[in-house]
Structure formats: C-alpha cells, structure tokens
C-alpha cells in the first residue's frame, strides 16, 4: 500500500507546473490519486524539459540515420564513427533559467551536466564549446550576468581539466534578463561497447555512485519549463551547486568501471534527479526498478521522499550492475573518494517502486513517467504571423545611402556580437590535455587532435582530428524562423569546411519562447522544418539535443518579453589530416584572395541580402525585411570545393562570410594576421552597402599562394557551376583597401580596425 497523506491539490499542481487535465490523467493511469511524492515525480517528468511535451512531434521530422551514426536520439548523447577506430560522443544542452537567477552556478553546473552525458556513454570528454546570449552590455545587469556565466563556465571546465575550445556569444535586447547558456561537449569512446541506459537483467543490483544527495536543485526541471519573472530570484534553491574536482574523479572512476564490464546500464542524475534516472532506465529496458531511499547517501538530515526524488544535487550516477559484482564496483568508487551504495534492484514488473522508512513511498508505471508522456496539441498557423508579414514588406532601397564605408565598417567591428571574444576566451583553459589544434578566434571551427585514449590500445596513433562548431544567426531566425534555421545548419557546415573537416552530424539546442501562443508555436515548427530540410540536404543527421522553451521575461507592466527564437546548431566533422587544417588569417603578402559563392555585385540573388543583417540593425536600430533564402545545393557544393582544396594543400587561409558580410570577413582576416589587402570589388548595379555588408550567399573567402595557383585554377575549372571571383591580394602594408571600379571606397589601417575589434567587449565590461 502506497502511503498517501492529504495535501492541497490545487497548490501542489501549481508548484509542479501541472494542469488540472494532467491531474485527471495521472489519476487515470494510477487508478487512484497520487501522493505528494508521486505528484512531484509526474511534475518533473511531464515538464517540457524532460518529456518535450510541446516539441516531440516536431522533432520526429529530423533525419536521424546515416552510415556514420552509431547512436541517435534517445540516449544520453549521440555517437558517430570518425573512422580509424575513433568513435565520438557529443551533445549540447541548455542551462538558461538557472543561469538567469544564479549565473555562476547555473553555468558551471550546465558544464558539469553535459560532461556527464558524455562519459555516461563510456567516452572520455575531450572538449567543450558553448553558445551564449545576453542583453545589451549598456545595462549593468547584463554585464553582471555575463561576468557570472563566463566565470562559471571557466571555473568548471578549467578545474575538471577539459578544454573549452570554441563557441559563440551574441547580444540583443530580447535576451535581457533571460540569457541563454548552451553547453556542448565531445568525448572519445574508451569502451568497446557503448554504454546504454536501459535496465537489463531482473534481480541485477542498482548502485548509486558519486556525491551525496541534498536539497539543492529542488524542482529544477519544472523551474526550467516556466517563464522567468521578478519572483524567479526566489527560486535560487532550484539552482544546483557543482563540484568540478569531484566530477574529475567521477569521470575516471566511471571509465574504469565501464572498462571492467561490470556495469550493464548507466544513467547520470541530471534534471529530475533520481526520479528521471530510475524511470528512464526502467522504461528503456522494459523492466522496473525498486529504489530504497534509506540507502541513498544524504548530506542533510530529515529529507523526505519528495526531496530525495526531486533533488538535483550534482555529480551523481545510477548504475545497473552484474549480480555479484556490486561490492567490487563500489570499492572501486570508494578508492576515488566517492560515495557508492547499493540502493535497489531491477524488477520484472515495469514499475518504479520507491521505499522510504520501510514503507512504499511511491509506485508508478515506468512508462507513465518516461515514455508514454503527454503531448500538447497546438494548431499551426496556416499563414505567417501578421507582424512578420508586415516586416517582410521592407526593401533594401529604404536604407539610407552609404556615405562613409570606413565608419560603417568600424561600427560593425565595434558591435559586441561581431567583435573579438578574447575577453571571454582568455578565461577558458583552451590547451589542457594538449590536443587542441585550433581554438576560438583563430579559425571558423575548433579542431582537436584524436589521440589513443588511456587503456585503449585498439586506436592507433594518427594525424586525425575532430572539428566542432556552434552557430545560430538569431537575427535571421527572428524574421523568418525557417530560413534562419536553414542558415544556422548551413553556417555550421561551412565553418567546418573552412578548416577542412567533413560535416558529419548535428546536435541541436532549440531555445524558444512559450509555445502556447500561436506565433510561438509557429516559430518553433518552422525552425524545426528548416533544420530538417538543411540537415537532409547537407547529409548531417541529428543525433539528439535539447529543447528549452518558455524563454521569456515578465515585464513591470505584466507583459511577456520573448527572446529571439534561437535554434543553436552544434555540428561535428572529421579531419583526416590535422596538418592541413586551415585558419582565417592571411599567411603571406602576395597571396591571391578569392571569393567562393555569390559575387558581391549580384544585386538580385535571393540568397544574399541586407534584411536581418548586422548592418541593417546598426543603421536602422531594428530588424525588418525577409532574410535571404539559403541555397542549400550551392552550400553543399561550396563546402565540397573548399574541403577538396584544403585536402590538396592549396589554400593558405579560409574564412566564411557571416555577420557583417564581406567587408567584416576581410577585416577579420587582416586583424588575425596583421597583414593588409588590396581588393577591387565590382559593384555592377548593386548598392555599395550591399556589396560590402550583405549576408548570406554561401560565401567563403580564401587565399592562395603562387605555388598553388595552377592546381587551384584546375580545381575551380572542374567546378564550373560555382562562382569563384578573384578579389585582389594580400599586402605587406597593413592597410585594408577596398576599391570599386570608380574609386577607393574604404582605406583603413589594420591597426585601427584591430583596436576597435579587440576593445569592444573589454570596454563594455569595464575591464582592461
């Protein structure tokens, strides 16, 4: 008999984020009313954060299979075959709401959580990336949020000993009070068998390892599935507290345990803690789990069953272990200074049964919590929202005529979204483990060397590497979520191609406002459609990811301020030879500069434009128009050409055109090398601002030295469908000179550009 003390049902439903209809469904499934602990279990497991009740039908449209995909959606992380015996686990997740109320710990535990997803699969973490969004830094509150978030990421990653090698940071008023903190991790498989999470073997013991359980992080999953308001500051107990040094030991102990073969299933305790780990293990295995809370190592006294089940204390894992091997396994963890306790067993009956003080504290069908969960039905708008349709009527002719190209470029280089992120990157240890080939700022994607992992002699030493990037043009997504999401996938693939990596697979983090408004759900649905289309065309299946909804903040007048929809794309690619990796800096004077993709003078190509561009926002102070429509077939062809040129050793540099367009990309390569350029652009009938600052067009800038010129011409001659335009050359004199047919349009010292570019963030952060 399940104990069931009386409680205020209406108040409890509100606390758990459940609806009256959810109560009715829970009662139907149980055949009785749930007790308070059981209601808490349903509250976290039926939240958007855990069960994707608003987004699951949309996610089902993603391509998830491919010849390199070893593990797709449904496990703790995706796994791809990199070749040469190397298998890579990777995933991205958000910690947005916790970071809004407690930026340091919210961001730090986001890093800890994504690392656990990786090593739970049997993979050793080798790299971290992140995608961050903040409000304007003119607001001291946003400065404080950014300082805390970056410090938290740096603290956890640096202490645990995993390099933070890449990422992106962008700013917009829509993120004020609701920052986005998305963390991505990569890991190399160390075990012959990939460790799965489904419970196996009736009677097998269930073992808890890691840290103790306390009251921190209570209800974190439900908290992450609600809007933010001024009262959210009172929810600091819903933010977990991490210990990276303990996690470092946990990584080593877990990898040892997995290598022993004693562990048959593993699940980390992240969102929803013990409730999620037990129910997911049971549901995925088609079995049940019995859990005795009296055996769970606790750091506080007097904890209730509800508190044990919903605690999100960090650095904890749950294992199903081969019968008879539990004592040896627990001794292994204790040698690492970690807690280890036998807390339950696998049941034949597919239920989650929880014992506390010798009585049954909860008993729930496993699938009711982790498989057969509710799906919200939303009507999809048949036409785009009226406000967007009105904005789409804007044309480039409404922009004022560009009068000072040099001043416009300097303003763009001072834009915190475009400017150097060295203020951020210098806080991260990018070189720990000594495998980082290229990190943030030096190239369009990070590259990490693949070395034989400890205790795994089956992987021969090689010159292979893995490249990774995170991308999202949130201005484009705000105006057209389908085109913007396509552009996010396209830019990620282009960034990988620019270092010579073959794009392989995607992990996505969908950061969106409430789906309960017609516009909110339409934005989410259109972005999912865009991701699906782009991933199919570019042959990059989705292996999993994260959905973070209700990213909006209640204003003083009671209205909700939604963020720009931000579908962040994390993408990984294989590098056959790290000695060929290409960076964005010019290499030597005299090298010829080429533009691959839509030429600058093309004033009509729909894949290139100023709508949604950094230049438009800088000039008008707002966004308008419909962003360019990505040509995914051209995108694939451009990427293929760039990768082939790098493989043949023909390119001295490669850099994609994204925020700020052609002029900003050229300036960035000058700043990175302290070399100049002499470039002549044909303007044709196009306006100068379009030639210099338009975005889109599947464009990559490359430089080629004289010795490689014949082979380069032969290669581009074999790709006649692609437009390749020679722009000019690299110069020893560090000046950025851009001419049109009629005159010098822009002439700036590279040193002046660099000073603006590098000082933009420190100046706003009030630091050196």
Swiss-Prot record:
Q: Name one GO cellular component term.
A: cytoplasm
The record's section on Gene3D superfamilies has: PurM-like C-terminal domain, PurM-like, N-terminal domain
Membrane-spanning segments: none
Question: What are the record keywords, sorted?
Answer: ATP-binding, Cytoplasm, Ligase, Magnesium, Metal-binding, Nucleotide-binding, Purine biosynthesis
* Predominant location: cytoplasm
Tell me which domain of life the UniProt entry assigns to the organism this sequence originates from.
Bacteria
From the UniProt record, which GO molecular function terms apply?
A: ATP binding; magnesium ion binding; phosphoribosylformylglycinamidine synthase activity
> Function of this protein?
Part of the phosphoribosylformylglycinamidine synthase complex involved in the purines biosynthetic pathway. Catalyzes the ATP-dependent conversion of formylglycinamide ribonucleotide (FGAR) and glutamine to yield formylglycinamidine ribonucleotide (FGAM) and glutamate. The FGAM synthase complex is composed of three subunits. PurQ produces an ammonia molecule by converting glutamine to glutamate. PurL transfers the ammonia molecule to FGAR to form FGAM in an ATP-dependent manner.
* Species per Swiss-Prot/TrEMBL record: Synechococcus sp. (strain CC9605)
Which proteins does it associate with, and in what oligomeric form? Monomer. Part of the FGAM synthase complex composed of 1 PurL, 1 PurQ and 2 PurS subunits.
Q: Which InterPro entries match?
A: PRibForGlyAmidine_synth_PurL, PurL_linker, PurM-like_C_dom, PurM-like_C_sf, PurM-like_N, PurM-like_N_sf
List, alphabetically, the Pfam families matched. Answer: AIRS, AIRS_C, FGAR-AT_linker
Where along this sequence does the record place binding of Mg(2+) 2?
A: 117, 268
Q: Where does ATP bind?
A: 52, 91, 508, 545
Which pathway does the protein contribute to? Purine metabolism; IMP biosynthesis via de novo pathway; 5-amino-1-(5-phospho-D-ribosyl)imidazole from N(2)-formyl-N(1)-(5-phospho-D-ribosyl)glycinamide: step 1/2
Identify this protein by name.
Answer: Phosphoribosylformylglycinamidine synthase subunit PurL
Q: List, from the UniProt record, the residues annotated as the active site of this protein.
A: 49, 95
This enzyme's EC code(s): 6.3.5.3
């Amino acid at each position: 008999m399940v104990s069931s003390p009386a409680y205020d049902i209406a108040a409890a439903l509100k606390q758990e984020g459940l609806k009256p209809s959810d109560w009715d469904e829970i009662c139907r499934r149980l055949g009785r009313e749930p007790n308070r602990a059981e209601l808490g279990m349903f509250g976290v497991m039926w939240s958007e954060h855990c069960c994707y009740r608003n987004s699951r039908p949309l996610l089902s449209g993603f391509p998830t299979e491919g010849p390199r995909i070893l593990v797709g959606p449904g496990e703790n992380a995706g796994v791809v075959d990199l070749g040469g015996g190397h298998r890579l686990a990777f995933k991205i997740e958000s910690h947005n709401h916790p970071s809004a109320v407690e930026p340091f710990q919210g961001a730090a535990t986001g890093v800890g959580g994504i690392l656990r997803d990786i090593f739970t699969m049997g993979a050793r973490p080798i790299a971290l990336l992140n995608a961050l969004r903040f409000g304007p830094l003119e607001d001291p509150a946003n400065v404080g949020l950014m300082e805390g978030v970056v410090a938290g990421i740096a603290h956890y990653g640096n202490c645990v000993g995993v390099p933070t090698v890449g990422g992106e940071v962008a700013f917009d008023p829509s993120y004020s009070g609701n920052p986005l903190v998305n963390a991505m991790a990569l890991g190399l498989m160390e075990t012959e068998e990939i460790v799965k999470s489904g419970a196996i073997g009736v009677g097998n013991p269930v073992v808890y390892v890691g840290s103790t359980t306390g009251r921190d992080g209570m209800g974190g999953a439900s908290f992450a599935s609600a809007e933010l308001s001024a009262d959210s500051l009172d929810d600091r107990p819903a933010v977990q507290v991490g210990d990276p040094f303990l996690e470092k030991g946990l990584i080593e102990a877990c990898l040892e345990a997995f290598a022993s073969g004693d562990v048959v299933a593993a699940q980390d305790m992240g969102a929803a803690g013990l409730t999620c780990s037990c129910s997911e293990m049971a549901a995925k295995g088609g079995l049940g789990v019995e859990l005795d809370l009296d055996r769970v190592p606790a750091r506080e006294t007097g904890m209730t069953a509800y508190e044990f089940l919903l605690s999100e204390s960090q650095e904890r894992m749950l294992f199903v272990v081969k019968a008879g091997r539990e004592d040896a396994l627990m001794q292994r963890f204790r040698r690492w200074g970690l807690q280890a306790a036998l807390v339950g067993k696998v049941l034949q009956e597919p239920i989650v049964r929880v014992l506390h003080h010798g009585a049954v504290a909860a008993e729930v069908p496993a699938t009711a919590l982790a498989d057969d969960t509710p799906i919200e039905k939303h009507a999809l708008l048949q036409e785009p929202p009226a406000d967007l349709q009105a904005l789409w009527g804007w044309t480039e002719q409404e922009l004022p005529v560009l009068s000072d190209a040099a001043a416009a470029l300097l303003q763009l280089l001072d834009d915190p979204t475009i400017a150097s992120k060295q203020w951020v990157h210098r806080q991260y240890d990018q070189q720990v483990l000594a495998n980082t080939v290229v990190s943030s700022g030096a190239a369009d994607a990070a590259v990490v060397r693949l070395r034989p992992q400890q205790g795994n002699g089956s992987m021969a030493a090689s010159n292979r590497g893995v490249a990774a990037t995170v991308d999202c043009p949130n201005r484009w997504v705000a105006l057209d979520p389908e085109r913007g999401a396509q552009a996010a996938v396209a830019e990620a693939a282009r960034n990988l191609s620019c270092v010579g990596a073959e794009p392989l697979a995607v992990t996505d983090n969908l950061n969106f406002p409430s789906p309960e408004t017609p516009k909110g759900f339409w934005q989410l649905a259109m972005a999912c459609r865009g991701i699906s289309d782009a991933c199919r065309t570019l042959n990059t299946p989705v292996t999993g990811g994260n959905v973070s909804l209700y990213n909006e903040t209640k204003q003083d007048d009671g209205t909700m301020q939604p963020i720009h929809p931000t579908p962040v794309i994390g993408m990984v690619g294989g590098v056959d030879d790290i000695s060929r990796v290409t960076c964005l800096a010019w290499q030597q004077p005299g090298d010829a500069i080429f533009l691959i993709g839509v030429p600058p003078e093309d004033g009509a190509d729909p894949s290139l434009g100023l709508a949604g561009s950094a230049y438009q926002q800088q000039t008008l102070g707002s966004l308008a128009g419909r962003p360019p429509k990505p040509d995914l077939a051209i995108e694939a062809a451009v990427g293929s050409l760039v990768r082939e040129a790098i493989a043949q050793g023909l390119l001295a540099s490669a850099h994609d055109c994204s925020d700020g367009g052609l002029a900003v990309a050229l300036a960035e390569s000058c700043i990175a090398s302290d070399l100049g350029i002499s470039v002549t652009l044909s303007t044709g009938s196009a306006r100068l601002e379009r030639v210099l600052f338009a975005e889109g067009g599947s464009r990559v800038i490359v430089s080629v030295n004289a010795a490689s010129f014949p082979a380069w011409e032969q290669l581009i001659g074999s790709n006649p469908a692609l437009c390749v335009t020679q722009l000019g050359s690299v110069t020893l004199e560090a000046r950025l000179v851009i001419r049109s047919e009629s005159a010098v349009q822009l002439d700036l010292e590279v040193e002046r550009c660099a000073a603006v570019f590098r000082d933009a963030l420190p100046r706003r952060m009030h630091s050196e």
